[in-house]
Amino acid sequence: MREIISLNENWTLSFPKGDHATEQVNLPHTWNAVDGNDGNGSYLRTTGVYTRTFTAPKQPREGGRTYVEVLAAALNSTVKVNGQVATTHEGGFSIFRADVTDLCHEGENELTIEVSNEDTPSMYPSSADFTFYGGLYRGVNLISVPNAHFDLDYYGGPGMMVTPVPTEDGGANFTIKSFVTNPADDLTVMYSIEDCFGREVASAVRGSADTEVTIYVPDAQLWSMDEPNLYTVVATLQRNNEEVDEIAANVGVRSFKVTPDEGFSINGVPTPLRGVSRHQDRVFEGNALTAEEHYDDAMLIKELGANTIRLAHYQHSQDFYDACDEIGFAVWAEIPFISVFKKGEGAHKHVMEEMKELIIQNYNHPSIMFWGISNEILIGGISQELVDTHHDLEKLCKELDPTRLTTIAHVSTTPVNGPMHHITDLESYNHYFGWYGGQMEQNGPWLDQFHAEHPDICIGISEYGCEGIINWHSNTPQCKDYTEEYQALYHEHMAQVFEDRPWVWASHVWNMFDFGCAARNEGGVSGRNNKGLVTMDRKTKKDSYFVYQAYWTQTPMVHIAGRRHAQRAGETTEIKVYSNQDTVVLYVNGKEVGQQTAHRVFKFNAALNEGFNTIVAVAGDVKDSIALEKVAEEPGYYTLPEFNERQEGVANWFKQVGSMDLTAPMEFPEGYYSVKDTMEDLAKNEEALALAAKAVKLATNFDIKPGVGMWDMMKKMTPEAMSNMISGMPEGFIESLNAQLIKVKK
């Protein structure tokens, strides 16, 4: 029988390049747990060598086969046993295995796994707005199986595919196919389907060389996000009265569809998908999470009220997919085909392999309904090769899995007409109106116009959000002040935008959790993207979290916002409350100051006494309370110093421009730089780069330096294109930059 032995303990990690000390570690492990999000501006991208010993297990009959199973190694790896290469693997997010039987000997064997998180010419991701953690961050197993066993070699798959389809009479057909290595006439495969209580509801037997069967189950319990009923399909390889090998998969019976006018439906019930995106890291742990931490993340998302998760931008842990199956989410799973397209046969092969691994390894998960083929891939420009690769990925998805829908996440600047449309079944845009570009009020009209002009496209929003840092607060929040109040105000608006448009097939907040991005330095917090509804350590739910809980949950709740804005000045102060109840009553120091009937967001103006005040909000049977202190003047530490500095910097920028006519059409004289040149081209001239980098710093607070941080992602962009994505840029700013650039000769 199959034996799975964890090899997660007692590893020695060394670094051949000498850039880190040798250490003893247990798995899961990443060497970027700290520097991947600590704000130093860079992190270690190198090769680490993990080494430990093991004793190869033996099967009773003919010794069997021994496999090393790596649950993920970021980003490239080589597995060796006793100094001999067992396998190599490119890609940092999927399972892979190596048959090491013939490399093992009696007694102790040395297992070495060389892992690198450095870039390669053909690998994805190449450049993106998150940290590429290095290491064996999901664990390693030793698997012992008889010579005849369920497959362990095919793209890291589970050895069985199960396709449950509901029938009109209330039952379901389970089409099952298992894959047997070394089938024989005296071997059979026994299938058993068990309900959630472990009771067998149907079974069948097939020969080991032809294993496919369709089994009917009457009165099937359907799987949905509200009722995630699971069945367990067990496949047992038998020889006479002997069990040779056994595998199992949890599956669900459901049907779903998406239409442009009605959005998403599951089991015939219209159900707009409203949820979040998720990265897989935590503060000072990086991506080396335990199974319990993955489950806790899923529960935090469920408590939010979300019914969908976009798992960005790569294959996630089986622990998290299992949690989604059990708890109930509609999952968008995707590959790291992101930001910058790489030309050539090697890169094309790699991205196709990543899609094969994603689908084959995760086919049985009922929570997964959408395969995402790329994210913001036009940041680096468009080419026919890029478009063709998308068509190839779409075709591959349908060949491997015709039961699910495909989707794509367009960068905001993707033209609404063009070759990137009508490739996938569904489409979504990453829009940040109200943060990087435009105003939050543009989101609804943009959706309405796109829907009217493209009535045949199922449209969603795959990313939207803004930074919210719990140190910063304001009574008059505005874009780019990084306050918790502006983030909450933004999400109040966006939650209503999507509630008013059920035909938007899915919306995904960017992001559920703050996450590591070593290249970032924004809002006074370095090394992280702070758009999360929850902090990276999972300790603090920002006020914006409760906006969605008010919109998306049924269990009565009430939350008083602004509790970290604890010192207030002025005769009165606004107290904002979120609730999914119709009416909220507010008390200040035990006295009722108001009762309101509203939709999700309740605003009260209240006078505070000198010193500390107790604020209580009551909504039906639930209540919340906070303490506020009245002060003569609000402390300066509520305001991000850089916010005022940037405003002063922009003013000084215009002073330097002088009397230029910024209302005149921009000119682009031949032989001189302009805002139409890419950052890569501008970098060829020190003066031109300095002008462009200063403008980007003032507009976004990003430091742009060749070869550093997000340079690879942004080097193909022009200042003109960036201006379409940057919010709050003063009128005439891009014109003033162009006026200065056209003085610099190429």
Where are the model-predicted features located?
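C-terminal beta-sandwich/jelly-roll accessory domains of carbohydrate-active enzymes
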Residues: 214, 218-225, 576-667
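Compact, charge-rich alpha-helical regulatory domains located at protein termini
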Residues: 662-734, 738
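Low-complexity, Pro/Ser/Thr- and charge-rich linker/hinge segments at domain boundaries
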Residues: 63, 137-154, 254-269, 628-660
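Extended substrate-binding grooves/exosites of carbohydrate-active enzymes
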Residues: 23-38, 84, 118, 123, ...
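Surface beta-strand/loop "capping" patches
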Residues: 149-183, 549-581
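Accessory beta-strand-rich segments of carbohydrate-active enzymes
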Residues: 3-18, 40-41, 45-153, 157, ...
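Accessory carbohydrate-binding/adhesion or oligomerization-edge regions at the termini
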Residues: 1-37, 110, 114, 120, ...
